[in-house]
Amino acid sequence: MKASSDSKGDIVSPYSSGPIENETRGECHPISAKGGQPEKENKVSLELTEEIIQSMEVGMAVRDYSGRISSMDFHRTSTYLVTASADESIRLYDVANATCLKTINSKKYGVDLVCFTSHPTTVIYSSKNGWDESLRLLSLNDNKYLRYFKGHHDRVVSVCLCCRQECFISGSLDRTVLLWDQRADKCQGLLHVQGRPATAYDDQGLVFAVAFDGCIRMFDARSYEKGPFEIFSVGGDMSDVNVVKFSNDGRLMLLTTKDGHIYVLDSFRGTRLATFNVKPVLSDATLEASFSPEGMFVISGSGDGNVYAWSVRSGKEVRLANFVL
């Protein structure tokens, strides 16, 4: 889940100096390509219930940054977490060991959004300097840019990778959505939109969604040039869309807006199943919300600095009594 919180915790990680490559400076512990996981892993199946949600506590806190966290992403198969901060840094953490593995500074370009590729030590990130809106494919192992993706002409506000293929999608305030292949410099597709776009792939990589102006447009990834095959409305809410996401099983979608609304929809019929409300975030921040792994709960940040959770089935808030920021 990405976040817009500037709250700070109580663990400061030690660093050792690293090399300078392509303007990014790194300080790190050695990085394992396996993402900190042992070769043989014992996995436990756990049914997530309201009682378990209510009993959750903060397990790791960090304060090794000097600006608001603008974006963060968990790797799908490793124990790694990557963050982007307003202090123009990218940080890689191993959450299983509560360790910061690497800090990379991007003073020249700034950093706004960041997300993992399929590899746990490679990320794609967007700039925040106001003059270069390129996306960059960065190796965290050696702090080297592997590829630049040029095409947007204003701030990139949405980036989503396809977990099944080496492709991703980005949306910008220049009112374009671009489709990319990580192996190519030039975009593979272009869509013009009429507002601030939010983008998302489903878990199978067969469908992607583009949301703006109170509607979610559904595209077949194999024939997107034909236009959307479905358009879902969230009921007249025309405020700027912040994020759109699919649940892991693809059955549900959520959409957040600048005004603090969170909508949950059936991704097949477009039926609105629930609406949750939080205090709006700052004008330059993003209201981020996510489904729990099985899709039964929604967890979101808020402009009041708190984290909230709701049951999708009942629509009721699940109190996070032990979750104090």
Give a label for each model feature.
Residues 2-325:
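WD40-repeat beta-propeller superdomains and closely related acidic/aromatic-rich repeat-like regions
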